[in-house]
Amino acid sequence: MPTITSYFGFLLAASTITTALFIGLSKIRLI
């Protein structure tokens, strides 16, 4: 169970970072 939880947390963190980077690039391109 802890392994699945940690994997889910890692997946969530990775998706959050990817989204943040994508939004940052979009803002830079808009500017």
Swiss-Prot record:
**Record carries keyword Cell inner membrane:** no
Q: What does this protein do?
A: Component of the cytochrome b6-f complex, which mediates electron transfer between photosystem II (PSII) and photosystem I (PSI), cyclic electron flow around PSI, and state transitions. PetL is important for photoautotrophic growth as well as for electron transfer efficiency and stability of the cytochrome b6-f complex.
Q: Which organism is it from?
A: Acorus calamus (Sweet flag)
For molecular function, the Gene Ontology terms on record are: electron transporter, transferring electrons within cytochrome b6/f complex of photosystem II activity
Q: Name one GO biological process term.
A: photosynthesis
Instruction: Write down any Gene Ontology CC term.
Output: cytochrome b6f complex
Protein name as catalogued: Cytochrome b6-f complex subunit 6
Q: What sections of the protein cross the membrane? A: 4-26
**Topology class, membrane:** Single-pass membrane protein
Instruction: Indicate whether Calcium appears among the record's keywords.
Output: no
Listed under subunit, the entry gives: The 4 large subunits of the cytochrome b6-f complex are cytochrome b6, subunit IV (17 kDa polypeptide, PetD), cytochrome f and the Rieske protein, while the 4 small subunits are PetG, PetL, PetM and PetN. The complex functions as a dimer.
Stated family: Belongs to the PetL family.
Cellular compartment(s): Plastid, Chloroplast thylakoid membrane
